[in-house]
Amino acid sequence: MADPKYANLPGIASNEPDVYETSDLPEDDQAQFESELEELCSDSVERIVVNPNAAYDKFKDKHVSAKSLDFSDRISKNRRVGYESGDYELLAEGCGVKETPQQKYQRLVNEIHELCQDVEKIQTSTKESGAEERLTPVALAQQAAQLKQQLVSAHLDSLLGPDAHINLTDPDGALAKRLLTQLEVARGVRSGAGADGKTAAPKGPDGVILYELHSRPEQEKFTESAKVAELERRLAELETAVGSGSDKRGPLSSGVQGSSLTETLELLQARVSALDAATLDQVEARLQSVLGKMNEIAKHKATMEDAETQSKVSQLYDVVQKWDAMATSLPQVVRRLTAVRELHEQAMQFGQLLTHLDTTQQMINNSLKDNSTLLTQVQQTMKENLLAVEENFSALDQRMKKLNK
């Protein structure tokens, strides 16, 4: 409570608890704030500036599927399914760690494998398209095969070690080469052991060398899809060469539309076989006769064209002769027309002036009529006023007479 001696002073609140305001935090909070401030100002703490908008744009439309995840504890031997990890590790952008050649190679191999699978799905799901500008599944398969061939030609086995397994284009050939090299090494070891009298290397049961063969079904699918792509490419080349469209058909391929490929080949073969030496002589003789007839037709056509041109020239000459008589009088006609044009312009101006005078005369007549009516009204009012004045004067005279009496 406040001191009683300040109870009756103005501006002092009474019957209220005392309040002492300060900008400092309570003592407990002050100690915690100082410790947090020291921790934030320490050099051991890495301060990262995070842009919320950039982070939102980075992870926009990204999601993690948790449909088949199970992180619960297990009592059986089967392992619970958590988040699945990939075959290789992708480094985040801006992490400051440089990607090693081994990681780059594994990433490229896995990406090309995924690309091949996507191309196979597209080839099985989509239909054939006639658009040449669009990237077709056949072109995608060819580009994927070229990328794999580039990876194989890089000879990364000797550079990256045995972990970099390259079995992309010919896994069977790679396994066969590896088996042959191991057999030769084993033969060399056997011959060395027999010559030196030393113990042979440890073998499998019954002294048989054991090999492990790993099948790659995805590689078989890829080779099959590559063969299909090559077949489709060759068929596309045949279609462009033989072509079923009217714009692609030549003189040899005319009349083969709608037939099968074998029938088309037989028809083309028959047409080509018809062009032998004996038939060519006959065709040449016929062409010579046709050429002579064409020359005669051209001569007759030239004479007919000359006759037509002569008739047209004569018609033009007659027209010019008719116009010679009129050409002498044409300047006079032109001068007369120019003079008549000036007269027409003056007459038009005079007509405009007459219409203006007519309108002004009508306005004056209307104003005179209005003035005459006003004058009659003024005259009538003046007469009425004179009569009233005369009556007033007569009344005034009578009153004066009465006053004089």
Curated annotation (Swiss-Prot):
Residues 1-24 are annotated as: Disordered. Its main location: cytoplasm. InterPro entries: Dynamitin. One of its GO terms (biological process) is photoreceptor cell maintenance. It is found in: Cytoplasm, Cytoskeleton, Microtubule organizing center, Centrosome; Membrane; Cytoplasm, Cytoskeleton. GO terms for cellular component: centrosome; cytoplasm; dynactin complex; dynein complex; membrane; microtubule; vesicle. Keywords: Coiled coil, Cytoplasm, Cytoskeleton, Dynein, Membrane, Microtubule. Belongs to the dynactin subunit 2 family. Subunit of dynactin, a multiprotein complex part of a tripartite complex with dynein and a adapter, such as BICDL1, BICD2 or HOOK3. The dynactin complex is built around ACTR1A/ACTB filament and consists of an actin-related filament composed of a shoulder domain, a pointed end and a barbed end. Its length is defined by its flexible shoulder domain. The soulder is composed of 2 DCTN1 subunits, 4 DCTN2 and 2 DCTN3. This is Dynactin subunit 2. The gene is dctn2.
